[in-house]
Amino acid sequence: MLSLKAAFAQHTRNNTRKEKARLLKLSINGRFLTQSLTGVQRYAAEIVKAMDGLLASGNAAPQLLDAEWQILVPPAATTLGELRRIKVKQVGTLQGHAWDQIDLARAAAGTRLISLANSGPVLHRDHLVVIHDAQVFKRRDFFSRKYLALHRTLGRLLARTATIATVSTFSRNELASVLALDPASIPIIPNSAEHFASVEPDFSIIESLRLEPHRFFLFVGSMTKNKNVDTAIRAAERLGRADFPLVVVGGDNDKVFGGGATQSSGGIVRAGRLKDEHVAALFARAAAFVFPSLYEGFGIPPLEAMYFACPVIASSAAAVRETCADAAVYFDPLDADELSAKMRERIDLGRISPLEQAKQRERLATYSWTKSAAAMLQVLAKPVRQIGPDGTAR
């Protein structure tokens, strides 16, 4: 027979096990750490780091502070740096969507799963998935047929089994339409440009590219149909100012988009992929940032430009207007002549004015990774799919 002391110890252990079993367990889909860095992967990384900071400082609902947190990653994943509350765990042997649907699904079983980069296990029920836009439904001309078929199917299946979140009011309405969802059921958890706060500009790139400060226009983005670099290049050619070249920063992605890169021509400086320190320097020294996207779910690069007080000449796409408001000048992204005229106006205006800078600061203050992470934690603190009429957790 157990002594009173031993019985008490066993009772305590049993209660501890029961308490641990009752704790909320949350898993983050870390597949984005194996992907090339675009706005989607940037979003996922910054949200994870900001959530970790809030959890470490005690700024979350009690059940989330007491919860077990982990980010599940495939083999060969990059690192996020030091995380204080979220444990990193490598799982599985597969890659890509197979890892999502098999390895991750198995490892995340019984936990609340957060997928921040457009896809995740379609059979996992307690699941929050951030889908950043509705491009695969609205602009089929941007993608290969194989990519369209896969991602449309994923989107429709996830809409049935998971809570869908997104990054803007525009994207919420688009996704609600194509996925037959109530817009009020889709939380909005936006992007930010705060990641550049820790980036020290490396101005050596100005000399390396043989540029004159404040005498060049800047495009930053992938060479894809959606990013519409062709219009920017045609506008620069029609501008006819060799002393104000267009610097094109970014890489290609033919595998996904079936081709879309444009060849270099006169007055164009093709810089290729650059590290953040060089991009920051170009933002800080450009005459203006040109953003001709045909379709966006949010539009991070204009905010990044504003962070360095760079004037923004942006596409009139709805999500871009939502993000930039009156802190940018707009043009029809299909009209190279209109963009060329806006570039000429910027040359005539010269450096950014105090009023323009004030408008930029107002837009930047609207968006914060910490605010977005707090919104994410608010949603995660509630039962799955329990979303209020304004798109926030109830």
Report the location of each language-model feature.
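Carbohydrate transferase catalytic cores enriched for Leloir-type hexosyltransferases
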Residues: 3-394
